[in-house]
Amino acid sequence: MQLMKEKQDLTYLSWSVYRNSSGTAGSFLKAYSELGGTKTYYKLSNFDKARGIIGHECVNELIVDRLLTILGIPHLSYQLIHADVTVDGKAHEVYLCASEDFKAKSESKIALDAYKELETLPDESALDFCTRMGWKDYIYQMLVVDYLILNRDRHGANIEVLRNSRKKTVRLAPLFDHGLSLLCSCSDDAAAAKFDVMADKPCNNYIGSKSTWDNLRIIPKDKMPKLTPLHESDRQVLLEGLDGVISQTLQDKIWEMIWKRWCAYEDFCNSR
């Protein structure tokens, strides 16, 4: 079940800060559990000690998960769960996201930027390194995704390398961690209503420039990813069940953003 609205008791989870949020007073908290041999990771949206949840990054994870499923792009699956949690001894009712460990047995993980430092050639760019490793198609798909959702934070640790030293295999983890995207900077409906969904805002990209639009030009015109087209009817799929989780204004604006950017991407492909 991708969306669990029936409230769960997750007060047993122990939360730790994994990133302070930029531009706000909050922070991002994570936890994990190991039940029945399965490791599950949990994340909260932007969290403030005084006010509780002040963001909707976990909802973004679910929406982007659904989007990538429609487009046919491999990715990590997320579950959005209505739950009671305890942070610093205080109870909070939240919507959090959960995902399973994407590492196979005997695999270890390392951030792409750290792996590149170990294996790079002199003066080799991140893109050239990934191309040499045979990962260019993955990178091209990632650049398209990051444009469609305006991913603000595809830094070098937001792409992970999975290594199996026994089998001597190296692969990239499925695309993950898309919370800082879409309208993540909008804390209320007024901000969402004014948000320019096509604005080319600077993003923290490990590969390419800070512009997700300019980064589309990195992809050779004969190498544009073959994606399943998005249709207006897909709005219902992307936003199913989110009434009462996020506002109608936010839902409408998120769809407007995804649809307009998809149309711009199609125009870009057709003009090359």
Where does each model-flagged region fall?
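Conserved ATP-binding subdomain of kinase catalytic cores across diverse folds
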Residues: 1-110
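A short, terminal or domain-edge coil/loop segment
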Residues: 8-16, 128-144, 184-190, 203-215
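Active-site-proximal structural scaffolding
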Residues: 57, 61, 138, 152-155, ...
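A broad, structural surface signal
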Residues: 62, 66-70, 137, 141-145, ...
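Short alpha-helical "patches" and their helix-cap loops
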Residues: 78-86, 157-164, 271-272
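ATP-dependent phospho-/nucleotidyl transfer catalytic cores
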Residues: 89-93, 98-143, 244, 264
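Conserved kinase catalytic-core segment
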Residues: 122-187
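C-terminal catalytic region of ATP-dependent kinase domains
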Residues: 166-272
